[in-house]
């Protein structure tokens, strides 16, 4: 007699249930293992690929000749460029100054067909541009300097009525421009340097006939100009950099490879070694260690860069950026690196590169959204770099931000 209380059919159902239950348990266990592997894999991808754009791919190239061996190391990094608000007026050959409150003042430049006297303010907190008061005279190839009292001094340039010796002061608190004392000499494509005592040194430039060697000083307490000692060479499209000891280094211009030092205490100029090539429309950037990095130029277009050491007053050729360029911009980042952006070579450039003074290497970083030359670049108080305007088959009104990681 069968003592099992379940029928054969019921027993088979129970056995099938147990078999499916065991199989389902195994399947669930396998699926959980697969999901765990996928989650770990995705985490690694996010960590090392997507969220680590600053990791560099480094390429080292060694070139040997009978006399020299040059090693060039290039890294590749992706940083963040993003569009910000457009300028109200498209422009190039304009000027920019960072105000004490963090806003950026853009002045003048060349529009689609003529010089501009309009001025605009960029607000980093809102990411937009607004018109402010117009200058009294339209200008391109002028200079713009933020003074120690917070006002902005705009000097010289080229206008429809000719080369300018005029100057204007902008008051950010009122948005009003005021004509101030005029320079003795009209000039454009000159350089302006804010000295340690607050005075403004104007050097060189072009007046339609000659490359100028003259220099003038603006006293903000009296708002007047006076002549200072002239440079040893006439120059335009040169650079003038304030060194840490208060002297001013003037480099290149007018296809020159010469450099001069100005001492504000004695108001004397002296030559200080020659670069290896002539440069104009280049950039010169004072590094945290006090040296000056010179990049690019249009006389002998080259990727070769040079470093000036103020302590020894000597020049050294160093590794250069990948791209030959001039009419570009150079901006010092908060980490001490130098951002080179845009410019012109065979065509207008979209590329950007970083120079790392700690290693002497160049880093190819992400491209801008727009090609541009004759633009401006301003380092904001938050460390970002604003690039605005410029030329690319016409005046541009676009602006973008570089955000270091």
For each predicted feature, which ranges?
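Alpha-helical transmembrane segments in eukaryotic/viral proteins
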Residues: 28-59
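Kelch-like beta-propeller repeat domains
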Residues: 46, 71-405
